[in-house]
């Protein structure tokens, strides 16, 4: 079962003006980004679990583990926002984020395992133009890595 997934930005990120502007992130744009990142995590975890031979269910029950996660310290160098101001963003990386993930007994809520990891987008030697599609591609790559780690650890536990 895939449970709650929350997303939080780096503590100063939302307060900083958008690249190339004097405008700050609108609350609705920030929420869309959080929802998109949470959706990517849910999608990739589900895909990896199913590919690994695990059944993903919607309800708690006997012998059901619940995966819950928080993406924290999310930092995006070129956020996708709806704004009249157009600014090109050049950076060495699309951004970074940290995951705090837990496996719980789905009935009792007891935490059986907890893990933390920092994921960073590919870095280049010199700044390059950051696009919205690069943001999503890099975020997906980080999240796919986390999904692979989850399945690998579940497989190792299953063998013991």
Residue positions per predicted region:
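A structural "domain/chain start" motif
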Residues: 1-38, 128, 152-160
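Generic short beta-strand segments
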Residues: 4-12, 71-75, 118
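Amphipathic repeat-derived elements
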Residues: 25-40, 70-84
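Stable alpha-helical elements in mature extracytoplasmic
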Residues: 37, 41, 45, 67, ...
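Sec-exported extracytoplasmic/periplasmic mature domains
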Residues: 42-54, 76, 147, 151-159
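Surface-exposed short loop/turn segments
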Residues: 47, 51-110, 121-130
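C-terminal/domain-edge helix-coil "capping" segments
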Residues: 96, 107-114, 118-160
